[in-house]
Design a protein with these regions (language model features):
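Acidic, contiguous internal or C-terminal segments within carbohydrate-active enzymes
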Residues: 156-209
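Short Pro-Gly-centered flexible turn/kink motifs
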Residues: 73, 120, 124-128, 185, ...
Length: 352
């Protein structure tokens, strides 16, 4: 407990939040749980100043832009809200619609997809989680900002420890250069032991790119031919456990139809890790590059006429139907040594 200059009591949890915010304001490399501050008169000013700033940061929206792109991000979930071409004034990012999917571009951490019965194990204990983990529902702090770069950070709390029992800082970093948007994920392990986690992106794109045209005019095109596999889904929207060859059409293409998603996401493995979303008889398209991600999920709302498609780079798969996994021993989970950091990225490029 701490009293400010007006003798108002500052609750312990709020004080922790203030310190975390202040630490991230100073540097994105600080370990917030080790900062020690003497609450002198200077400390009183410090707390009040950053308390006001921390509260002001909730549910905020930030933009970055250059000559070609304008990108918007909100602090809840550090979620993309807009990817707009300044050249053609085209909004490429799905803008959310309750009828189909209200999200736009979730960041997935520390799990990808669904857990069996929304539960998973970690070091002998069972935890309950929403699909895609904790990042999507939590407020991030703006840790750093320039004209073309935004860095957001989520630090563990008592609430997150009840869902994912590890101390961490999860950074989501957006940077634009030319017609490219780079989305980086950085996980900082604050534990004195190894931790396990999964990562992924979930950006949705308007299809068609503009009001004219039909969904079926579009297709995916991989940059190289590989022996692509499809991880089949079960009616529960979990993985069935069956992996089958997937036959590409000519020129390494996958035609888009609404029927393609009747069983939920189409999950690809063994891709070349570069795919473009294109339209027939058009030179306008976008390219997703995901060099460190083993899987690509392609999704829209099943059994709908939804005018969007999500291209989702994943490090790991959702749960297999009927099986509750242990995250630490999951065969495709990422592992991070004590007090170390892991960083990866995917990149989006617009072609107009």
């Amino acid at each position: 407990m701490y009293q400010d200059s007006e003798k108002n009591v500052v609750p312990r949890e709020k004080l922790k939040k203030i310190f975390r915010f202040a630490a991230l304001s100073f540097t994105t490399e600080k370990k917030c749980d080790t900062i020690e501050l003497h609450l002198t008169s200077v400390g009183a000013y410090f707390c009040e100043h950053y308390a006001r700033r921390a509260e002001a940061e909730e549910n905020m929206y930030y933009e970055i832009e250059n000559a070609e792109l304008k990108v918007g991000v909100e602090t809840k979930g550090a979620q993309l809200k807009s990817i707009r071409s300044k050249k053609t004034d085209t909004e490429y990012l799905w803008q959310g619609d309750e009828e189909f999917w209200k999200g736009r571009a979730y960041n997935l951490f520390p799990i990808v997809g669904r857990a069996y019965k929304n539960k998973y194990d970690y070091e002998g204990k069972t935890y309950e989680t929403r699909p895609h983990g904790i990042a999507r529902d939590n407020e991030f702090v703006l840790a750093d900002r320039t004209a073309t770069k935004l860095s957001f950070a989520l630090t563990y709390t008592e609430a997150t420890l009840k869902i994912y029992p590890c101390k961490f800082i999860f950074y989501v970093i957006y940077e634009i250069f030319g017609a490219n948007l780079k989305v980086s994920y950085r996980v900082q392990n604050l534990e004195q032991k190894e931790i396990a986690f999964c990562l992924g992106g979930h950006p949705g794109f308007n299809v068609p790119f503009h009001p004219s045209g039909d969904f079926e005019d579009y297709f995916l095109e991989f940059s190289e031919k590989t022996a692509i596999k499809q991880c089949l889904t079960a009616p529960s929207k979990l993985i069935s456990g069956e992996v089958v060859p997937f036959s590409l059409h000519a020129n390494n293409r996958v035609p888009l139809t609404h029927d393609l998603f009747k069983d939920d996401a189409v999950i690809f493995a063994n891709t070349c890790r570069e795919v473009s979303l294109k339209r027939k008889r058009s030179k306008r398209y976008l390219t997703l590059r995901y060099p460190d991600f083993r899987y690509l999920g392609v999704w829209q709302t099943p059994n709908s006429q939804a005018p969007f498609v999500c291209l989702e780079p994943w490090t790991s798969l959702p749960a297999t139907d009927g099986k509750r996994y242990d995250l630490f021993t999951k065969d495709d989970a990422l592992h991070l040594a004590a007090e170390s950091a892991y960083e990866t990225a995917w990149t989006l490029e617009l072609h107009e």
